[in-house]
């Protein structure tokens, strides 16, 4: 079974538990933190995948490092350790977030701007682009990109709405280059 299929199965099972226990948001937050740690700490993944380190030692390491995790997440990580699949935690997290967003009828979006946006600006953008995307709401994260010159660029899933000055200049350049042929 492919890694993504396995991640989907574990994410789906964990999501079912999250729904039953009304802990979707809490589990999503915990998984997001775990994902960052797994991605940024190569040593952790090395230890968890090392064949000479016993499963009990690996679980003890997780328990000591992430003792504040909910029982559901902790048991899922332990199960992944037992089945030698701890490397799928980042993919499992992504799949869990997709399921949670579907249940909430929301999506995550990144708004790139030249300067940080205010809460009011982000709320307004959330409402406008939620309508465009045909969903109930957007959870917006703002990233500053000074190379945009002005305007904004919004990424929702794999869709990009580019209203930046640099994007407009690039489109004009392509049109002019295409017209000279």
UniProtKB/Swiss-Prot annotation:
Its main location: membrane. GO terms for cellular component: plasma membrane; proton-transporting ATP synthase complex. It is a peripheral membrane protein. It comes from the Bacteria. It is found in: Cell membrane. Keywords: ATP synthesis, Cell membrane, CF(1), Hydrogen ion transport, Ion transport, Membrane, Transport. GO terms for molecular function: proton-transporting ATP synthase activity, rotational mechanism. SUPFAM superfamilies: N-terminal domain of the delta subunit of the F1F0-ATP synthase. Belongs to the ATPase delta chain family. F-type ATPases have 2 components, F(1) - the catalytic core - and F(0) - the membrane proton channel. F(1) has five subunits: alpha(3), beta(3), gamma(1), delta(1), epsilon(1). F(0) has three main subunits: a(1), b(2) and c(10-14). The alpha and beta chains form an alternating ring which encloses part of the gamma chain. F(1) is attached to F(0) by a central stalk formed by the gamma and epsilon chains, while a peripheral stalk is formed by the delta and b chains. HAMAP family: ATP_synth_delta_bact. F(1)F(0) ATP synthase produces ATP from ADP in the presence of a proton or sodium gradient. F-type ATPases consist of two structural domains, F(1) containing the extramembraneous catalytic core and F(0) containing the membrane proton channel, linked together by a central stalk and a peripheral stalk. During catalysis, ATP synthesis in the catalytic domain of F(1) is coupled via a rotary mechanism of the central stalk subunits to proton translocation. This is ATP synthase subunit delta.
